């Protein structure tokens, strides 16, 4: 299984002709393809930890699996680079007499696009394949009451014909993920199931790697964090931000690309693939941190797009910024088409610029520097 996955990663790297190293593309593909449903992130965290360990001064994980890699330990200020490791998923909730599995959602999964998909149930004895059942259109075309599916109506078929057979394979509480994997599309565009938010954990790891190459120039302590359970309530970020007590934090997540038909840009903003990362202004984003990021991007010719936040961002930034006495924080986002679907599309060129920007921010920090709103 491991060698097959590694071979696929090498094939993808050989087909990619862009700004990232082959080793980085291979890491991204392994990270995306490793299932990490909310509350069950350990397999993906191991992939992340294996990658960052060679260039970190220290690594550790906490009781729930938030995983941290530290560079320049003891430096000041203390900078946290955070991204969540989990993906939207489902969980086995009930097994009926015929052996079909009924599910509950973990995170913002859409029942309408989940029907007729291949899935994997993650059990203590290994993965079990299944499909989300779907009634053929021939059998429903004369049904005047046909409606969009609800989560409680979805069922998973694992190829058995009784509850007893099903219970030999799966248990209530086993997590379920969709089985679509990483692939290159055209140019620098890639498609996958879980770019939300493996691109973030990839970016913070890459930023740490880049910083490790010029560690002597670094005055800040940098803590790269792959945190858990964002999709079900921003839970891991609360835990690890409280533990680490950073002086400043940069959060990486995806945002909605709005450059395709049917999306109202007047309502949702104008965000495109291939036009650079997005920086959020307002809300919990500290104005001085945002201004520093803008200036650094301009000096390094990194194109930025901008989004407005009047209150919450819906990301880990929302809980990090009010931890303890308030941590100066900013959100950097990667535009993502078709978010929370099996076919999320991102630009790898956009993605490559995020660790560059975070590394530049870390290098810009002077010993003991603080970010405060000027009164």
Set out the residue ranges of the language-model regions:
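N-terminal hydrophobic/helix-forming segments and targeting peptides
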Residues: 2-375
